[in-house]
Every structure is written in C-alpha cells, then in structure tokens.
C-alpha cells in the first residue's frame, strides 16, 4: 500500500465512509480532499436500479455540461466534400474517408469522439471491432451519425459527453476540473443527474438512483444523499 502524504493523513479523518452529504457539501469536501499536483477532475459514480443485460433497462445518451469538461476533446469525422470542409471549419482534428479508416485500422485511435455523415457508414461499418470496444462507434441515437457534422463537432468540443451504464448498473463520468470552482461544478452535476433521470428506461424496477458518490481523480469517494436529487 502506498504511503499517505502528510496532507492525506491530515484529511483522512474528514471522510466518514457511511455519511451521506448534500451535493454542495460533497463537492466542497472533494475539493478539500484533492492532494494531487495536477488539476484533478470531479468524478461521479451513480449506482442505478437497472440490469443492462436486458435491452429495456439500458441507460445511454449524451448531455452537455454547461461549464464544459476542461478537456481538449480530439474529434475525427468521416465525411467528404462540403461536409468535410464544414467539419474542419468547426474544429475537427481529423477528417477523411477511406484514408481515415486505414489510419484507424493501423491503430491511430487517439480520439475522444468519432462522427460520421450517414453516407459514410458503409466505410465506418468496417471499423466495428476497432471502434466498438472503445465506445467510439458513431451512433445516430447519440448524434454522432448526422448530416450536420459542424454542429456535432462543436457539441463534442463544447462540453458534450456520452454516458452509458456498465454491466453492474453503474455509470461513471467526469464533471469538469476542480479548478472550475464549486458553482460551476454544481451546474455540471445538476445537468448530468438530470440527464440520467430523464434517461430512465421503461424496464427499470424499484428505486432508480440508488447510490451516488463523488471523488477527485485521485481522492476518496464522498457519498451524496440521493434524497436531495430531483426525480431520482
């Protein structure tokens, strides 16, 4: 086990593993507990009352964090002609067709979002085994297969994130850098939780949002009182 720093030891007693905190209190505590020498991310883990092995209990979608993510998201776009030019003008990092496919098959996958126009899906379809496991496969339900590539690129660069429930019913996401301050982090928290609540599937049974915890990239988890969450 790694040795605790003096600051970590001093803060260790501040976290009661069983205590439920209000959202504002939890965000403040996470920021106080951050000890890394870099600008850590506020991370959320939500335990949902769903079993994603059943199609009618899948939770997946996109949400725009009003204060952004604090990250530079690299975006690749499959498009030709006028759409390719629009994607580049909107800030896409890489735009192409067969050439982009070959580049990705060669292992160049350093992207946070992959977007495609509908007519390019014949090419993109060949990348299913390459992009699928990384969660990068363009999907019309997520707005990443679209004729409006410029809007999709701007959304990806402007704080839009994708979410998807994992096998055990948990959703993880980053809600921005701790340096954003408590007010902006709260705005991002509210937007994310609201999106998850609205994405409640028809097959969900019993209590939907069961547990919520916040932490910094390297810090301990702080439990949030779900009674404070609207619609949860």
Swiss-Prot record:
Gene Ontology biological-process entries: regulation of translation; translation
Database matches in Gene3D superfamilies: 3.30.190.20, 3.40.50.790
The organism's place on the tree of life at top rank: Bacteria
Range of residues in the leader sequence: none
PANTHER family: 54S RIBOSOMAL PROTEIN L1, MITOCHONDRIAL, LARGE RIBOSOMAL SUBUNIT PROTEIN UL1M
Its job: Binds directly to 23S rRNA. The L1 stalk is quite mobile in the ribosome, and is involved in E site tRNA release. Protein L1 is also a translational repressor protein, it controls the translation of the L11 operon by binding to its mRNA.
Entry's family note: Belongs to the universal ribosomal protein uL1 family.
Protein name: Large ribosomal subunit protein uL1
């Amino acid at each position: 086990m790694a040795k605790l720093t003096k600051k970590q030891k001093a803060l260790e007693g501040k976290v009661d593993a069983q205590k439920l905190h209000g959202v504002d209190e939890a965000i403040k505590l996470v920021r106080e507990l951050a000890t890394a020498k870099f600008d850590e991310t506020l991370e959320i883990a939500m335990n949902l009352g769903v079993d994603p092995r059943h199609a009618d209990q899948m939770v997946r979608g996109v949400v725009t964090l009003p204060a952004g993510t604090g990250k530079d998201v690299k975006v690749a776009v499959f498009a030709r002609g006028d759409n390719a030019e629009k994607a580049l003008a909107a800030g896409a990092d890489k735009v192409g067709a067969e050439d982009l496919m070959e580049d990705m098959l060669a292992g160049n996958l350093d992207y946070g979002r992959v977007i495609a126009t509908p007519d390019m899906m014949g090419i993109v379809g060949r990348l299913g085994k390459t992009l699928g496991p990384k969660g990068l496969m363009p999907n019309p339900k997520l707005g990443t297969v679209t004729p409006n590539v410029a809007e999709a690129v701007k959304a990806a660069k402007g704080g839009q994130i994708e979410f998807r429930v994992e096998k055990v019913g948990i959703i993880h996401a980053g809600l921005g850098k701790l340096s954003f301050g408590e007010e902006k982090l709260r705005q991002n928290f509210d937007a994310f939780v609201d999106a998850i609540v609205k994405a409640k599937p028809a097959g969900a049974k019993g209590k939907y949002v069961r547990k919520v915890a916040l932490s910094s990239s390297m810090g301990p988890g702080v439990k949030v009182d779900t009674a404070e969450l609207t619609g949860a």
